[in-house]
């Protein structure tokens, strides 16, 4: 009898991707985050679908429809907070996943890496538009400030902003289109994930040593399915602790005030996962310069393969590069902290220094350290 798992047109794709997939025998728990991101995406799509059943994308009723979900819908509060904190879990896993790629040199798989960068931009756009939907004060003013950045683009900026707004200010048309995009983008993300995996399975996974693992592979199931399951349980524990004990910990109290175009909140700031980029944006006094720095702070990931000077792929045996990597990590924590602080001395200076350090480390210091390590190893 032929094995249906290996011969059925649909099942053999699943089989070759998640069951009989040859995987390196030494990949650590840092490789868990890909599957956790898949779980986060599934959670966001499911909870989002249930929220969309009760939400109305209209400026007059959006805020009260979210209130209605929390108060009147059966377990609506759980669905709403799972969705809100699920986004935080998503970005936490994303940042660790990217950090793992940088540390172990996974960016040398260029197609997978580039699709990953497109995925990052798409997820950020989706999260930004989702934050606008409850139509609280921070939703409205966040949308106004961030979309207004496009007006810095020469010649077409103002027209572009009004085109996105669907009028002369953030209003009903803006909310409706943001809801439409927020609904469709996760499915586009799911399609991009398939492309990401397609390219990954063309080359095979990297491993902590950064060497070829062709001579030593093990099947993905049961070894890595059970390992991923442990990661999933731990992530679920963290997510449910947040949702059930402190659901508003990562949110902004201002978003519990309905949007009012006539009253500006004292400090306009995005969710925690955008704060590092927001700090870089604010550290440059010029509007266009700030926007370019903001975009380049993420787009810089695309040129990292070109900046890789070391002869070794991974940082496992490169202690100097490890120091630089952890300094970069600490710098990102500082930028995240600064992004949530008011614009005043000495915080402005700290933000500017941290922004300079961020770009210097990636563009100058780390490539130089790679060359120094080559020299030390007489390579």
Curated annotation (Swiss-Prot):
Signal peptide: none
Residues binding heme b b566, per UniProt: 97, 196
CDD domains: cytochrome_b_C, Cytochrome_b_N
Gene Ontology BP terms: mitochondrial electron transport, ubiquinol to cytochrome c
Cofactor dependence: heme b
Keyword match Nuclease: no
Keyword line: Electron transport, Heme, Iron, Membrane, Metal-binding, Mitochondrion, Mitochondrion inner membrane, Respiratory chain, Transmembrane, Transmembrane helix, Transport, Ubiquinone
UniProt binding sites for heme b b562: 83, 182
Protein residues bound to a ubiquinone: 201
GO function terms (MF aspect): metal ion binding; ubiquinol-cytochrome-c reductase activity
Membrane-spanning segments: 33-53, 77-98, 113-133, 178-198, 226-246, 288-308, 320-340, 347-367
Entry similarity comment: Belongs to the cytochrome b family.
Summary of subunit composition and partner proteins: The cytochrome bc1 complex contains 11 subunits: 3 respiratory subunits (MT-CYB, CYC1 and UQCRFS1), 2 core proteins (UQCRC1 and UQCRC2) and 6 low-molecular weight proteins (UQCRH/QCR6, UQCRB/QCR7, UQCRQ/QCR8, UQCR10/QCR9, UQCR11/QCR10 and a cleavage product of UQCRFS1). This cytochrome bc1 complex then forms a dimer.
More details: Heme 1 (or BL or b562) is low-potential and absorbs at about 562 nm, and heme 2 (or BH or b566) is high-potential and absorbs at about 566 nm.
Role played: Component of the ubiquinol-cytochrome c reductase complex (complex III or cytochrome b-c1 complex) that is part of the mitochondrial respiratory chain. The b-c1 complex mediates electron transfer from ubiquinol to cytochrome c. Contributes to the generation of a proton gradient across the mitochondrial membrane that is then used for ATP synthesis.
Name recorded for this polypeptide: Cytochrome b
Organism: Hapalemur aureus
């Amino acid at each position: 009898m032929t094995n249906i798992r290996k011969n059925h047109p649909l099942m053999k794709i699943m089989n070759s991707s998640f069951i009989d997939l040859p995987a390196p025998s030494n990949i650590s728990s840092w490789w868990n985050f890909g599957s956790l991101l898949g779980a986060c995406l599934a959670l966001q799509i499911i909870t989002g679908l249930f929220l969309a059943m009760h939400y109305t994308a209209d400026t007059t009723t959006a805020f009260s429809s979210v209130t209605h979900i929390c108060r009147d819908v059966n377990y609506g509060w759980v669905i709403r907070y799972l969705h809100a904190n699920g986004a935080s879990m998503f970005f936490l896993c994303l940042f660790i996943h990217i950090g793992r790629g940088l540390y172990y040199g996974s960016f040398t798989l260029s197609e997978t890496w580039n699709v990953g960068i497109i995925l990052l931009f798409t997820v950020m756009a989706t999260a930004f538009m989702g934050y606008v939907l409850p139509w609280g004060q921070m939703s409205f003013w966040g949308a106004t400030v961030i979309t207004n950045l496009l007006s810095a683009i020469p010649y077409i900026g103002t027209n572009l902003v009004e085109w996105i707004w669907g009028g002369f200010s953030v209003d009903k048309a803006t909310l409706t289109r943001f809801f439409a995009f927020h609904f469709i983008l996760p499915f586009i993300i799911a399609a991009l994930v398939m492309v990401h995996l397609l390219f990954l399975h063309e080359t095979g996974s990297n491993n902590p040593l950064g060497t070829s693992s062709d001579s030593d592979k093990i099947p993905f199931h049961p070894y890595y399915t059970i390992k991923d399951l442990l990661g999933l349980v731990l992530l679920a524990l963290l997510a449910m602790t947040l949702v059930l004990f402190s659901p508003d910990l990562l949110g902004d109290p201002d978003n519990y005030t309905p949007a009012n175009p006539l009253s500006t909140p004292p400090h306009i700031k995005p969710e925690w996962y955008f704060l590092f980029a927001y700090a870089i944006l604010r550290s440059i006094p010029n509007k266009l310069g700030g926007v370019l720095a903001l975009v380049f702070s993420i787009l810089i990931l695309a040129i990292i393969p070109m900046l890789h000077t070391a002869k070794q792929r991974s940082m496992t045996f490169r202690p100097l590069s490890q120091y630089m990597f952890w300094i970069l990590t600490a710098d990102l924590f500082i930028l995240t902290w600064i992004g949530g602080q008011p614009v005043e001395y000495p915080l402005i200076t700290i933000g500017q220094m941290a922004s300079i350090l961020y770009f210097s480390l990636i563009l100058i210091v780390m490539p130089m350290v790679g060359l120094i390590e080559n020299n030390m190893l007489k390579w």
